[in-house]
Amino acid sequence: MEALPSNLIFHELIGLYAEVFESTNPKLINICGRVIDETRNMLIIETEDTHEKMVPKNGTTFVFHLPSSSADHDQRVKIFGTLLLSQPENRVKNIRKIRMR
C-alpha cells in the first residue's frame, strides 16, 4: 500500500524522512532525518550526521516527507504524534479493520 496523506497514520513510518515541527521539549525542534526505528512511544530518527535521536511521539508534531512520482519535490504531511501512539504493528493492522466497516 502506498503512503498517502490520508492513510499515513496507519502506514509504516520506517524509512520516511521526518522533521520535528513542534515539541514540548524545545531541544527537539528541527531534528530531521530518516526514521530508522519506531516503538510505541518513540520515533528513532537518524540525522544527517548519523546520530540517532529518540523523539517521543506524545507532545510532538512531525512533518513527514512522502516521496512523490515527480522528482521535483516530496509531499509534506504534518501529523500530531499523539495520533501515532500505539505499537507500530498494531497501527498498521488497524487500517484493515477500518476498511472492513
From Swiss-Prot:
Gene3D superfamilies, alphabetically? Ribonuclease P/MRP, subunit p29 (2.30.30.210)
Q: Which SUPFAM superfamilies match?
A: Rof/RNase P subunit-like (SSF101744)
Q: Which Pfam families match?
A: RNase_P-MRP_p29
Give the record's keywords alphabetically: Cytoplasm, Endonuclease, Hydrolase, Nuclease, tRNA processing
Which terms under GO biological process does the entry name?
rRNA processing; tRNA 5'-leader removal
Q: What is its EC number?
A: 3.1.26.5
Among InterPro entries, the record links this protein to: RNase_P/MRP_Rpp29-subunit, RNase_P/MRP_Rpp29_sf, RNP1, Rof/RNase_P-like, Rpp29/RNP1
One Gene Ontology cellular component term attached to this UniProt record is: ribonuclease P complex
Reactions catalysed according to its record: Endonucleolytic cleavage of RNA, removing 5'-extranucleotides from tRNA precursor
Compartment annotation: Cytoplasm
Stored SMART domains: POP4
Q: Which GO terms describe its molecular function?
A: ribonuclease P activity; ribonuclease P RNA binding
- Subunit structure of this entry? Consists of a catalytic RNA component and at least 4-5 protein subunits.
What family classification does the UniProt entry report for this protein? Belongs to the eukaryotic/archaeal RNase P protein component 1 family.
Q: What does this protein do?
A: Part of ribonuclease P, a protein complex that generates mature tRNA molecules by cleaving their 5'-ends.
Q: What is this protein called?
A: Ribonuclease P protein component 1
Q: Which organism is it from?
A: Methanococcoides burtonii (strain DSM 6242 / NBRC 107633 / OCM 468 / ACE-M)
Source organism phylogeny: Archaea, Methanobacteriati, Methanobacteriota, Stenosarchaea group, Methanomicrobia
The gene designation is rnp1
